[in-house]
Amino acid sequence: MKNFNLNKIIRPNILAMKAYSSARDEFKDASKDLIFLDANENPYNNGLNRYPDPQQRDLKQILSQIKNISTENMVLGNGSDEVLDLIFRAFCEPNQDNVISISPSYGMYSVLANLNAVEYRKSLLNIADFQPNLDDIFSKIDTNTKMIFLCSPNNPTGEIIKRNTLTEIVENFDGLVVIDEAYIDFSDEQSWIYELENYPNIIVTQTLSKAVGLAGIRLGILYASKEIISVLNKIKPPYNVNQLTQNKAIEILKDYEKINAIMQVLIEQKAVLKQALENCSFVEKIYPSDANFILIKVDNANKRYDEFLEKGIVIRNRTNDDLCENCLRITVGTEEENSKLIETLNSL
């Protein structure tokens, strides 16, 4: 980070381009009683006949109040995958640059790298504690390494990356460090969004799909410095978050007490599930989890996966992931769902 220069990270063509200005961008601060005859919309009101706010200002304002972060430090997208893709397109030169990610981790990083013709370099976690291997990560960095992806809490392992480990990476890498915090609401650790002023080279992504319970509307949030946000707004599709998504997100986020109450129930249910797993004969190891799921090592993952499926319970078989041989990932369900799961555990 000592030599971090954003202008050297941005693709030259992106640095030079001008952002597309949509019809609603031009009048985003205008009075709502204007007659809009500029965007070739159907003028008859049905609640959705107008284009949505391209900057999602009302939704960002609520997120700003919840997170205590300026709206100028946000980009919203059609799920986290869209904002992650924006990062690749803004900063990585196809067929030239590379990115590094811990492994095992979220599979879309490699998919997006391949989609954007960017070399993807895996760094295996330490098998003993599922923490990043710093020596290995730093050995993989070269002059064309633009970004390091760190999912924390990590999927599928469930563990949060130790803060001193993340700090060492952020402070000693001159590119961008992307911290994926999809599961941060289930952890006691403080989010890295509150370090944006201290570290201009970090990008933090979050989602409404997990703790908030809005996976069906697809809404991802990216937090970064105002300079990085300005770059991403250049290339973001103007109406990438539709009006129905914005409306539903605002509706649910207004009752954050209810969201917190549900999160607390899930955390309690995770403890119940963990205790049941500890008493299960075919479970060989239960990995620590700061997320809403538990990764377990069993005697035969393929066999146990099929047995659960026969009982009508779908879990995730991670046995083909790096370092996850014979591992299953179980999402914490409702009390009723967990009871059915525990009943099945006891019957196998």
Residue ranges of each PLM-predicted region?
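N-terminal "arm"/small-domain region of PLP-dependent enzymes with the aminotransferase-like
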Residues: M1-Q65
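Short acidic capping loops at alpha-helix termini that bridge into adjacent secondary structure
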Residues: S70-M74, N95-N98, N144, E181, ...
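Active-site phosphate-binding strand-loop segment of PLP-dependent enzymes
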Residues: A128-S187
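PLP-dependent enzyme catalytic core of the Aspartate aminotransferase-like
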Residues: N164, E310-K311, N320-L348
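PLP-dependent aminotransferase class I/II
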Residues: N201-N279, I286
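Conserved PLP-binding catalytic core of the aspartate aminotransferase-like
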Residues: I267, N279-K311
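Phosphate-binding glycine-rich loop
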Residues: R57-N98, N116
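PLP-dependent aminotransferase-like
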Residues: L6, E93-L150
